[in-house]
């Protein structure tokens, strides 16, 4: 009898603990078939910085609306309004099964921290404050296929060794972060370009590969405003460069439609203070729910390159992109997306971005030799679990 009572008590205790904690397995599986014209190869030392001849390509990709991923996230109620939180999230190519983010197991996010009524403080690999805020103000929400996320928010939009605070106070959301070492290296993509980045946390080199930023967003009714700043100090040669981004953005939306627009200022300098890149970036677009299950998205991007490697003679690129997304259920949708870029590859991949999109995705959007435009179209399916 006593054993029975103890067993029942143990089961009740376990139930109480489980009620205070949760762990969720989640993910996205997204694949598409794509046609692109005028494709070359990203210029690198291995090909003597030559994009090669232009060709048309028909291929299968992983991630069109969302990067394919899987992850675990959870919370534990510690009492008194205090919770512990964690997330482990890895990206993968669904067309090959290979890990993304350089083969990392949890390359998209990996963090642990605490949460109270006054905000959340987390430690690990995570998104910058600027990226997290801009994501709510771009029409395609950083759709993997053609939206130039790295161009808008910086190549370092994910950083290792980061401490980040997020607080929500009514209509105001505040974020701030510091990274001890971003864990990112940008390869040379032209004879005059520099190799930038590293792991950071170097003894005696407090500034090397560090980064920081902050952002605010405010929403009232149908209108929302946001501002953000990000700085990364990558290793360049024997010193540290300074890569800066600042943005202001707005969104107006209803249940059926919304319009977003923004401006981003950017400046990259090397370890000696010499200007590597100075550019302005603009975006505008919107979403319209034609039917309960059909949403259309249109977006225009323009990059005004003031100076690249000391030269002002860079033809400014622009892109227009369209998405038709049809929901088969709450978790599965099919989509058609197309984009046209001028004076750059799709996602505005060019020397001014270090061909970040091509190198990150593994599928080139670099313009082939002698070309000035690129057209792409993709048909895909996404399942969220």
Model-derived segments and spans:
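Gram-negative bacterial Sec-dependent N-terminal signal peptides
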Residues: 1-19
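Residues that define the transmembrane beta-barrel architecture of outer-membrane proteins
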Residues: 54-68, 105-108, 157-161, 168, ...
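Outer membrane beta-barrel
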Residues: 21-35, 53-181, 217-221
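Transmembrane beta-strands of outer-membrane beta-barrel proteins
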Residues: 23-31, 80, 84-88, 121, ...
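Outer-membrane beta-barrel architecture
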Residues: 71-73, 111-113, 164-166, 215-217, ...
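Outer-membrane beta-barrel "beta-signal"
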Residues: 328, 369-385
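Transmembrane beta-strands of outer-membrane beta-barrel pores
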Residues: 31-37, 90-94, 127-129, 171, ...
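Detector for outer-membrane/organellar transmembrane beta-barrel domains
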Residues: 207-327, 339-340
């Amino acid at each position: 009898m006593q054993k029975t009572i103890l067993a029942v008590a143990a089961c009740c205790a376990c139930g109480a603990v489980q009620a205070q904690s949760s762990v969720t397995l989640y993910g996205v599986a997204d694949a598409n078939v794509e046609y692109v014209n005028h494709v070359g190869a990203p210029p690198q030392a291995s090909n003597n910085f030559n994009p090669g001849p232009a060709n048309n390509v028909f291929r299968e990709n992983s991630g069109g609306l969302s990067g394919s991923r899987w992850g675990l996230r959870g919370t534990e109620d510690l009492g008194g309004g205090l919770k512990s939180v964690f997330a482990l999230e890895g990206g993968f190519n669904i067309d090959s099964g290979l890990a993304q983010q350089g083969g990392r197991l949890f390359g998209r996010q990996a963090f642990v921290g605490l949460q109270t009524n006054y905000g959340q403080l987390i430690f690990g690999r995570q998104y910058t404050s600027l990226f997290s805020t801009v994501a709510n103000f771009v029409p395609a929400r950083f759709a993997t296929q053609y939206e130039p996320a790295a161009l808008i928010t910086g190549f370092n939009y994910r950083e290792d060794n980061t401490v980040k605070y997020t607080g929500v106070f009514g209509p105001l959301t505040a974020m701030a972060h510091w990274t001890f070492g971003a864990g990112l290296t940008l390869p040379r993509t032209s004879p005059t370009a520099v190799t930038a980045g590293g792991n950071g946390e170097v003894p005696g080199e407090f500034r090397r590969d560090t980064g920081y930023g902050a952002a605010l967003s405010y929403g009232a009714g149908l209108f929302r405003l946001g501002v953000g700043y990000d700085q990364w100090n990558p290793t360049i040669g024997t010193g540290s460069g300074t890569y800066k981004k600042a943005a202001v953005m707005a969104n107006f939306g209803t249940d059926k439609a919304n319009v977003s627009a923004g401006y981003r200022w950017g400046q990259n300098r090397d370890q000696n203070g010499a200007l590597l890149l100075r550019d302005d970036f603009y975006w505008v677009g919107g979403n319209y729910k034609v039917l309960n299950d059909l949403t259309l998205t249109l977006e225009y991007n323009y990059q005004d390159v003031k100076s690249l490697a000391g030269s002002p003679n860079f033809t400014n690129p622009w892109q227009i992109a369209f998405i038709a997304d049809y929901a088969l259920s709450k978790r599965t949708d099919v989509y058609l997306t197309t984009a046209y870029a001028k004076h750059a590859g799709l996602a505005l991949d060019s020397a001014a971005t270090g061909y970040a999109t091509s190198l990150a995705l593994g599928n080139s959007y670099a313009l082939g030799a002698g070309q000035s435009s690129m057209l792409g179209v993709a048909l895909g399916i996404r399942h969220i679990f």
